[in-house]
């Protein structure tokens, strides 16, 4: 089983940017956590981060072309603005989980709108970096039941 973990703008600055909201874990540490959890679940996790919307669309399309079984996406600020990401996720029809490190529903009003949620099987918010591991567990369970595809 292969999952694509796609991260949007500023997530490369985890551990630096607003630790009160996002914690002290760096992006490199997050990727290591994901890879360790993937090994326990006997799956391959392809981790990617970009600050550019078109690059994220390209990665979603690559997930389709590479026959990924699932996508975990933290679109960051693009959550609230990107119809392009919504359209890309809808077009590939790969089971997807939206993850946010902070509890976006308790932050500014504009952060409470998610354009991509409509293309996702689940949304996980406010669980810190552990939300990614929860998303991996969810997709493994969903896919092992033969659901989602």
Question: Which functions belong to the PLM regions below?
Answer:
Residues 1-4:
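Extreme N-terminal starter segment of soluble prokaryotic enzymes
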Residues 9-11, 76-79, 102-104:
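Short glycine-rich anion-binding loops that position phosphate/pyrophosphate groups of nucleotides
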Residues 14-28:
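Glycine- and acidic-residue-enriched helix-capping/strand-helix junction motifs
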Residues 31, 35-48:
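Short beta-strand elements in bilobed, periplasmic/extracellular small-molecule ligand-binding domains
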Residues 41, 92, 118-119:
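Short, structured coil segments at secondary-structure junctions
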Residues 44-49, 72-73, 123:
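Short catalytic-loop micro-motif centered on adjacent basic/acidic residues
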Residues 47, 97, 106-149:
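Short, glycine-/small-residue-rich phosphate/pyrophosphate-handling segment
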Residues 50-73, 77-93:
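N-terminal small/polar loop signature for handling phosphorylated ligands or for N-terminal nucleophile
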């Amino acid at each position: 089983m292969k999952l694509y973990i796609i991260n949007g703008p500023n997530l490369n600055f985890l551990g630096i940017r607003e630790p009160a909201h996002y914690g002290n874990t760096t992006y490199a540490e997050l990727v290591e956590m994901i890879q360790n959890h993937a090994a326990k679940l006997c799956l391959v996790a392809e981790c990617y981060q970009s600050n550019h919307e078109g690059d994220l669309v390209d990665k979603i399309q690559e997930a389709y072309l590479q026959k990924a079984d699932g996508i975990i996406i933290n679109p960051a600020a693009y959550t609230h603005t990107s119809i392009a990401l919504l359209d890309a996720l809808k077009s590939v029809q790969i089971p997807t989980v939206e993850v946010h490190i902070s509890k976006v529903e308790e932050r500014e009003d504009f952060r409470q709108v998610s354009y991509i949620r409509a293309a996702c099987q689940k949304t996980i918010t406010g669980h810190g970096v552990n939300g990614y591991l929860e998303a991996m567990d969810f997709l493994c369970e969903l896919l092992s039941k033969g659901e989602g595809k």
